[in-house]
């Protein structure tokens, strides 16, 4: 594959083939962005009819934590690029695939290994790069966990070292919370059951996602780092419910946020978009986490930017130029399933789309749960406050209903 120079025709011998590992709502948008550039896309997930399966050229259902199954699928499909979109993947298999020269792993196999494990990325950020973070400790057993909580102090945040979307995450405020927090973390971790991170609680003013793009500069042919406008977001139980762009912040805080984002993404290397999560208080900024792929809070960029985070990711991994400029203030608000049922329907769509500046993305997930993210309302506005009000109004208008 000639990075940045040549794209083929899908379903032909000249095809440029990309395999996405994870075909949820974020993967679906990446697939659409790739297909607009004539890329042949193979979508892989652990369950059938995932959102990305519905729009890909080919779809597969496998256990992506099984290294043999993953390697066999890559050998069968022979993609030029493998793009992880979730955490629950056999990353050692990706490293072997990359080392053997079978295909390129985005951004790199090492970056995937580090960022899919909170321990790896925290040690890189705090211990190797010296970035500001909350105090932290790791624990493998309940006794180690209780000792870590005592050392960090109350309140503290507990997370499995491998989980996503707030699963297994809780705040420990007293002795009474310790055992329930351990049980919840054990239930929420995807792999490496039994290992958690305990983090000191930072009193922050707000959280941001600093979307950071590593792409090839067409003028120099070298990798260049660029930034989207900062995204503010509201989290409930570790899962995002609202996001907006741009998040107002001081010039010093923005400078520090981008310096942290640049340093951690440069250490990870490769091409693509990274979602760098940061805490901000006044001019002070702390590193929290980084995802080497589009970020759920970045769904707002479907309305706010000329090139969304998904288009930026697609372009960057293909070696194409990117333009991460903000077009308009915008916001997103999550639409939950509201009930536990397969094949639900949605009412109120007309009312939602009647809100000025509003749009919807209904993800097409085959099964709903009460707190599963099934869609998102987007809205633009003259400013962030207006956009947030419109997005929330549009989301509230959508009513998930039983199709039985």
From Swiss-Prot:
| Chemical reaction(s) catalysed | N(1)-(5-phospho-beta-D-ribosyl)glycinamide + formate + ATP = N(2)-formyl-N(1)-(5-phospho-beta-D-ribosyl)glycinamide + ADP + phosphate + H(+)
Q: Which residues bind N(1)-(5-phospho-beta-D-ribosyl)glycinamide?
A: 25-26, 85, 296, 365, 372-373
What residues form the membrane-spanning segments?
Answer: none
* GO MF term set: ATP binding; magnesium ion binding; phosphoribosylglycinamide formyltransferase 2 activity; phosphoribosylglycinamide formyltransferase activity
Biological process (GO) annotations?
'de novo' IMP biosynthetic process
Keywords tagged on the record: ATP-binding, Ligase, Magnesium, Metal-binding, Nucleotide-binding, Purine biosynthesis
What's a single GO CC term here?
cytosol
- List the pathway annotation: Purine metabolism; IMP biosynthesis via de novo pathway; N(2)-formyl-N(1)-(5-phospho-D-ribosyl)glycinamide from N(1)-(5-phospho-D-ribosyl)glycinamide (formate route): step 1/1
**Residues involved in ATP binding:** 118, 159, 164-169, 199-202, 207
Q: Name one Pfam family in it.
A: RS_preATP-grasp-like
Give the matching PROSITE patterns: ATP_GRASP
**Source organism superkingdom:** Bacteria
Task: Outline the subunit composition.
Answer: Homodimer.
Q: Which NCBIfam families match?
A: PRK09288.1 (NF006766), purT (TIGR01142)
Protein name (Swiss-Prot/TrEMBL): Formate-dependent phosphoribosylglycinamide formyltransferase
């Amino acid at each position: 594959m000639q990075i940045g120079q040549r794209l083929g025709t899908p379903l032909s011998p000249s095809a440029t083939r990309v395999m996405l590992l994870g075909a949820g709502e974020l993967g679906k948008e990446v697939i659409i962005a790739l297909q607009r550039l004539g890329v042949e896309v193979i979508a892989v997930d652990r369950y059938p009819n995932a959102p990305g399966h519905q729009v890909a050229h080919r779809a597969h259902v496998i256990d992506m934590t099984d290294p043999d199954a993953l390697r066999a699928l890559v050998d069968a499909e022979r993609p030029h690029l493998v793009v992880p979109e979730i955490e629950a993947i056999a990353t050692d298999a990706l490293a072997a695939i990359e080392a053997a020269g079978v295909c390129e792993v985005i951004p790199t196999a090492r970056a995937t290994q580090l960022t899919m494990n909170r321990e790896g990325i925290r040690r890189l950020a705090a211990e190797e790069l010296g970035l500001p973070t909350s105090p932290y400790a790791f624990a493998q057993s309940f006794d180690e966990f209780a000792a870590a909580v005592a050392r960090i102090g109350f309140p503290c945040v507990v997370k499995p070292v491998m989980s996503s979307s707030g699963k297994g995450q809780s705040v420990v405020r007293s002795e009474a919370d310790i055992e329930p927090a351990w049980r919840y973390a054990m239930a929420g971790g995807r792999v490496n059951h039994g290992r958690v991170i305990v983090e000191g609680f930072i009193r922050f003013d707000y959280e941001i996602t600093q979307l950071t793009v590593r792409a090839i500069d067409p003028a120099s042919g070298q990798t260049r780092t660029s930034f989207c406008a900062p995204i503010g977001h509201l989290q409930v139980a570790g899962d995002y419910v609202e996001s907006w762009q741009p998040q107002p912040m001081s010039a010093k805080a923005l400078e520090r946020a981008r310096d942290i984002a640049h340093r951690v993404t440069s250490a990870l290397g490769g091409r693509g978009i990274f979602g760098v999560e940061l805490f901000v208080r006044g001019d002070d900024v702390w590193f929290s986490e980084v995802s080497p792929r589009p970020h759920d809070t970045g769904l707002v960029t479907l309305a706010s930017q000329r090139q969304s985070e998904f288009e930026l990711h697609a372009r960057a991994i293909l070696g194409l130029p990117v333009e991460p400029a903000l077009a308009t203030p915008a916001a997103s608000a999550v639409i939950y399933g509201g009930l536990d049922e397969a094949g639900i329907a949605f009412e109120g769509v007309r009312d939602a789309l009647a809100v000025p500046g509003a749009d919807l993305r209904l993800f097409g997930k085959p099964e709903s749960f009460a707190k599963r993210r099934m869609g998102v309302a987007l809205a633009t506005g003259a400013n962030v406050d207006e956009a947030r009000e419109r997005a929330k109004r549009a989301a509230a208008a959508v009513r998930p209903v039983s199709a039985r």
